[in-house]
Every structure is written in C-alpha cells, then in structure tokens.
Amino acid sequence: MSSLSPELYGCLGNSGLKVSKLILGCMSYGKKEYWEDWVLEDEEEVFKIMKAAYDAGIRTFDTANCYSAGVSEELVGKFIRKYEIPRSSIVILSKCFFPVRKDLIKIFGDLSSRGVHFLDSPELANQCGLSRKHIFDAVEDSVKRLGTYIDVLQIHRYDPHVSAEEVMRALNDVVESGKVRYIGASTMRCYQFIELQNTAEKHGWHKFISMQNYHNLLYREEEREMIPYCQKTGVGLIPWSPLARGLLTRSIDANEETIRSKTDLYTRALEFGAGYKAILSRVEELAKKYNVSMATLATAWSLHKGDYPIVGISKVERLKDALAAVELKLSEEDIKYLEEPYCPVPIQGEI
C-alpha cells in the first residue's frame, strides 16, 4: 500500500466527506467531436493519467454529464472498473444542468445566432435546466454512465426559470434515493446561492456542501461576496480553472502557443483587468525564485486561500507540477505581491 500524505486531504466544508485537496478535472477527457479540439481522446493515455493521479493521492475526480456528451463520465467509470479501484477510496463529483448532446457546441451556436437562450429553446425542452424532471433524468443517466453512485452532485448553473423549492426538493430526493451522497453548486451569484441554501434550511432538506466557482489570480471577483459567505457558513470551495484555462502557466509571449489557447471558446471570451500582464510577470518571477513552474506557483496560491482547486492534467509529466503546489508554502508577502496588481473585471462564467 502506498504512503499518502495527510497534507493532501481535508473535509469538504463542514461535511464529513474527505477529499483530496487537488481534484482531478476530467473535462479534458472525452471526444474532440463532441467538445473541443484540445480534448484528450486516447483512452489508454487518459487511464494512465488517472491511475498516476490516483496513486499519487489525487483521489477526487470532477466531471459533468455534458462533458463530451457523457463520454467523460463513461471514462471515469471505465477507469474504476479497469483497475478495480475500491469505490470507497475514490470521490466522484459530477454535475447536471446543461444538455447532454453530441452537437452541443453547434446547437448553442445556432440558438445564439437566432437570439434564443438554450433554456428557452423548444428543441431542448426538459433536456436542460433544473426542473425536477431534468434533475432526476440527469442523475439516472449519469449513474448509468459511471456505473456507480455520485458522491457530490453539483448543479452546474442557477436556473432562473425554476423555483428554489422545486430545485432543492428534487436535489434532496436524489440524495435520499441513494444515487447521490451530497449536493454542491457551481457558478452563480451569491444571492442566488443564498436563496437555495435558505430554502433547504427552511424545509429541513439537504444543503449544498460545496461551491465550484471561477477563481484564480486573474479573476478574483468571487472574493467580494461568494467566498466570504461560503467561508462563514462552512461551504467548501473547489474553484474551476485555477490556472485561468492555462494562461497562468506560461509567460505572456507564450500564451498563444497551445491548441487550447488558440481554440478554447471560453478562453477567447475571457476579459482581463489592467493588471493582467503584471500578474503574469509576478507569477513567472516568483516561480523562478522558488524553482517551480508557473502552474505550481498559481496552484499554490489557490491552496493558500483554502481552496481545493480542480486541476486539469493532459500529460502524466504535468502531474508533478500540481503535486509540488501542496509542498510549496507561499509567504504572506508573496501573496500580497501576487495580488497587488489585480483590477476588477466584469462578472464571468455565468450562462
């Protein structure tokens, strides 16, 4: 049995669920045709990365039903069966909200060109959002693809068309069904999250134990309301894209070199404040000072904030950069130096 560092684990918020402080993001694994060109399709390579992460102690995997039209979830399930991973030793986070379609990118583009929001689209009726019907259908399908239960089911976004009572009752019921152990949320306004939590509290239903929000050195708007609220109420923070879609891993001049930086639709839509270049320069400077990669430095900042960041690993060799972040202890002076150039930016990540 391998020796795993206690430093790599912690409870998710006030819950008793222990997760690895680094969470393996599985959006990168699936099919290019169903998602984007930077997705890793080779199953054996995907399993090699997952096994290396698992052996190193990263035993919490984050996926979603919509990633590559469900292929990402299928790969997580196949990995568990291929290596006969004890189910009790791994934590699976998945999500529901978006449609699960092989033509998802195309249909979103078509609807956008017609000025129709996907939640209002007749073609996607009951295939997205947070209605009781869709939540139940999504959980049934995810459990089939995974071949097992979901440890934390996260609502991918807030649905303004469905009442808080309907959403939280449905989530409570899927937990009571045994197909889901806990519930979490992702990317919404703080007042929306509070409304949902208060509704669950009022009725004695299961509440969210985690918030998966967009938070990194280039985007810190969540520090105004959402993060303080979560910290105050014991909700665990598991930020997605702690490396800002890879932008925090390379110097400014190198940021147009990867397939992802050239083709990722979300990356191209990002907006950065006036301090963007200064922040990247300081990340690069401190990375050299500590003799680590920029990815390690940026991930260490996230860990310092008390977050359990979701890390995307596209090659086994990159795993060491993520693990090194757990060992790297930044000083308060380092943190201040990294954060100082930040300037406010528009709210991002919402639908």
Curated annotation (Swiss-Prot):
A Pfam family that the UniProt record links to this protein: Aldo_ket_red
Keywords: Cytoplasm, Nucleus, Oxidoreductase, Phosphoprotein
Annotated compartments: Cytoplasm; Nucleus
Organism: Schizosaccharomyces pombe (strain 972 / ATCC 24843)
Name of the molecule in the record: Putative aryl-alcohol dehydrogenase C977.14c
Classification via SUPFAM superfamilies: NAD(P)-linked oxidoreductase
Main location: cytoplasm
Lineage: Eukaryota, Fungi, Dikarya, Ascomycota, Taphrinomycotina
Family membership noted in the UniProt record: Belongs to the aldo/keto reductase family. Aldo/keto reductase 2 subfamily.
